[in-house]
A protein has these predicted regions:
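Alpha-helical transmembrane-bundle signature of multi-pass membrane transport and export proteins
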Residues: 1-346
């Protein structure tokens, strides 16, 4: 777990930096262009490549050195951040240039998440998989739980360019953490190749199967699995619609609230709303014996109710409370959907 702990630390720092940049760019685009579509374009450029490239990145993580993929992804994303910094040097940053930098950074960052999660298989025994996975989820949640409030406090002091510089610095720290783990594993493997080979045997078997299937074959196999199970198709469609609705709400929150609150207050509101994820995760633990369909229905119902309530309240803190309910409901639906998917596939 020592090596996993170092990777988790790097992931936490990097996630925090990513959240700082995302918050700062959204605020600047709204202030500069005055439209929700400008903020939406930046968010789309930042997250769409990660989602679209995730299957291919996962296939690559099964075939190549995962730590090297993480180093390339984190170091390469600095290039995109440099493009964004160049755009922000203008008094009126061009939307196209900012989006281009976000796309470049996001495309390279897409390599890191699947490789990081797959590294759990390499570095920990089977009985520690759940523990390591939980640590990774907690680290990735930093961009939602801590980054907005921190960005709201820092932005009046150092500006959005300062936030982007911090983000680039966190990428380099993550590269250093990953490189340290990679070097330590190579040294340990050279000193005791027998023990290292025994530890890596399960991962090598998985990679061998993936290499035989090929990246494209793995993607097509996953698609055929979804297409051949009516229950999976319905579940994917349902979660796609729910994710789309939540994405629309997230994009519109800042344009709705920024005219009424300060940047620091906006960051605090987002952080308070995101803490609902911790409550939702606790509810999943308490309801661990509930049927997955019950979890899915409860999560989607809570999310839908919260979204309906958003425009009915009196002000910013009402929106924060509705956001809290939305994030608290998400772990329920995600846990239910994951169990249903595993049941269909297995």
């Amino acid at each position: 777990m020592r090596h996993v702990g170092l990777l988790v630390l790097g992931s936490f720092i990097n996630s925090l930096g990513t959240g700082l940049t995302a918050f700062g760019l959204a605020v600047v685009m709204l202030a500069t262009h005055g439209t929700a579509s400008s903020a939406a374009a930046v968010q789309l450029s930042s997250f769409a490549p990660i989602v679209l490239l995730a299957p291919a990145a996962g296939a690559l993580a099964d075939r190549y050195d995962r730590r090297l993929m993480m180093i390339i992804g984190d170091a390469g994303s600095v290039l995109g951040l440099s493009i964004i910094l160049l755009a922000l040097s203008s008094p009126r940053p061009r939307l196209a240039q900012v989006c281009a930098g976000a796309v470049v950074s996001s495309c390279l960052a897409a390599l890191t998440e699947p490789a990081l999660r797959a590294s759990v298989t390499d570095l920990v025994p089977r009985e520690d998989y759940v523990r390591a996975s939980g640590l990774l989820q907690l680290a990735s949640a930093a961009k939602y739980l801590l980054a907005p409030a921190l960005a709201g406090l820092l932005m009046p002091l150092i500006g959005v360019r300062g936030l982007v510089v911090i983000d680039a610095s966190t990428c380099l720290v993550t590269v250093a953490c990953t490189a340290t783990v990679r070097r330590a594993l190579r040294t340990a493997g050279a000193r005791s190749p027998g023990a290292r080979n025994a530890q890596a045997a399960p991962a090598q078997e998985e990679r061998g199967a993936a290499e035989q299937a090929g990246s494209g074959g793995g993607l097509m196999a996953g698609w055929r699995t979804i297409a051949s199970h009516p229950g999976l198709r319905l579940l994917v469609a349902l979660m796609t619609v729910a994710t789309l609705a939540i994405g629309v709400l997230q994009v519109l929150i800042k344009p709705i609230l920024m005219p009424m609150v300060s940047t620091a207050a906006m960051g605090a509101i987002e952080t308070i709303a995101a803490t609902g994820m911790l409550v939702g995760a606790s509810l999943v633990t308490i309801m661990k014996n509930a049927r997955p369909t019950t979890l899915l229905a409860a999560g989607l119902a809570g999310t839908g109710a919260a979204m309906v309530l958003v425009p009915l309240g009196p002000g910013a803190w009402w929106v924060s409370a509705c956001g809290f309910l939305t994030f608290a409901s998400l772990p329920l639906s995600q846990a239910g959907a994951e169990v249903l998917v595993r049941g269909e596939v297995d």
